[in-house]
Amino acid sequence: MSDKKTKGLEWQEKPLSDNERLKTDSNFLRGTILDDLKDGLTGGFKGDNFQLIRFHGMYEQDDRDIRAERLEEKLEPLKFMLLRCRLPGGIIKPYQWIEIDKFAREHTRYQSIRLTNRQTFQYHGVPKGKLQPMHRLLHSIGLDSIATAADMNRNVLCTSNPIESELHQQAYEFAKKISEHLLPRSRGYLDVWVDGKKVESSDDLLKIEDEPILGKTYLPRKFKTAVAIPPLNDVDVYANDLNFIAIQDENGQLCGFNVLVGGGLSFEHGNTKTYPNVAYSLGFVPLEHTLAAAEGVVKTQRDFGNRSDRKNARVRYTIQNMTLDGFRAEVERCMNIKFEPTRPYEFTERGDRIGWVKGIDNNWHLTLFIESGRITDKPEKPLMTGVLELAKVHKGDFRITANQNLIVANVAEQDKAQIEAIARQYGLIQEISKLRENAMSCVSLPTCPLAMAEAERVLPDFISELDKVLSKHNVADESIITRITGCPNGCGRAMLAEIGLVGKAIGRYNLHIGGDRAGLRISRLYKENITLQEIVNEIDQLVARWATERQTNEAFGDFVIRSNIIAPVVNAHIDFWDATKIIPTTII
């Protein structure tokens, strides 16, 4: 750590949060989890272990739909775990999918697989007694869930661009390298869940009981990383703590990355010390310094991030405390090189290309729309069986996108008809509106303990109502990026939507508008604590104006800004909560 400890380290004068004690006492994340696994009196974990399992990629949850009923019967809530796999760039092999599907059907309460907007899959409803078998299964097929939650670098995103196959492969390889480089070295995960068996992807990193990058108390808070390939911003690159924007040379080869830091979308209702934020640029690094830059940012956050107040512990708050120049200087000191000036780039869109596209390598790629990422079997749509049948015959790979969809990638010309026939048979190819195609939600109720309102379960009908509004005003073929999140923690990325709903209470939401299509602008609160029907009515009025008053090809989010319906968020740490404080030239 630098000797200059004043700027950015004022939090050290306050008591540390209890999470810091927990990590210190955890014996490198082992805790007493093994003892809890033997305790059949409860379906959950006790004491510190409730938090420690998050470092191993799990959260304890319960079915909130039946919580009151079980309370009346004097039973504890129906506890189970969420498991989030580590899957850099979202690439998974068909043979892996077949095993994942089997476990979901046989051992999870909801018999479903949830694709997330962080390019991985989650199990919901895993009973405690099935946790070790689940981790051993993942290990046996070359997967794990290390560091997909808690105070570590989480699953690394990478643009799912099937057309630019060579560039995507180069960027994807760096996403994997970044993920591996920033993993914890502790053997705790292996000792608890795999009984010390060799892990194919991470074993070399976990042999030494030391944490030279993360430190023995790991990071102050969650840490998210993404790799984006312009012009597609499907990973919402401005929404993460650490971001790498791929830059090509004159021959179209990857030559390095622009590095951005300090993005993040979580905040707390009414707490003006919290705010969502788009990332800032540190500059450009050539390929050979990519891992050094990643390590430098992590070490700077490790040493300067707030360990007293977890609500102000993400990278954006560290930058606010240190200033951007101060943060950059510390990162440069850690990696022992200077950033070069930011290279030019442009993002134009962030949605997936639903349907077939052909890559420059002449392979075909089929992007399947999966509403809210939920893969399950319903009588009218047996999607889960459909993906399983695809996995049985597909010779390429699957790619989970940051928009919660699934790409059947690298399909040869002669296999295309068979893949399409299976997808159509099981309802995986369907006609949907542009609005629905670009909509997203978090899981929320009934499993998320933080949920204040519904999200995934209300999204389909809500989008249907908005489709009617767009048809009414003759703009049914247009797209408005719409997202619902059940609380302000930001999992649904609603704060980068043109229309964003943030749960406030059961049946009530805050309506935010004014984000842009490329994901460069935070949306602003427009109406507070209103019902879904009231939101539809508000959007009806706004779309009526947009349909008649917009400029050529003007997006909805840009229109509401230009028309002074809502003020833009220019510098979120200053004006997110109060638009009268907008100072366009403000520099941190």
From Swiss-Prot:
Gene3D superfamilies registered for this protein in UniProt: 3.90.480.20, Sulfite Reductase Hemoprotein, domain 1 (3.30.413.10)
Catalytic activity reported: hydrogen sulfide + 3 NADP(+) + 3 H2O = sulfite + 3 NADPH + 4 H(+)
Top-level enzyme category: oxidoreductase
Pathway in which this enzyme or protein is active: Sulfur metabolism; hydrogen sulfide biosynthesis; hydrogen sulfide from sulfite (NADPH route): step 1/1
Cofactor(s), by name: siroheme; [4Fe-4S] cluster
Biological function: Component of the sulfite reductase complex that catalyzes the 6-electron reduction of sulfite to sulfide. This is one of several activities required for the biosynthesis of L-cysteine from sulfate.
Protein name: Sulfite reductase [NADPH] hemoprotein beta-component
Organism from which the protein derives: Actinobacillus pleuropneumoniae serotype 7 (strain AP76)
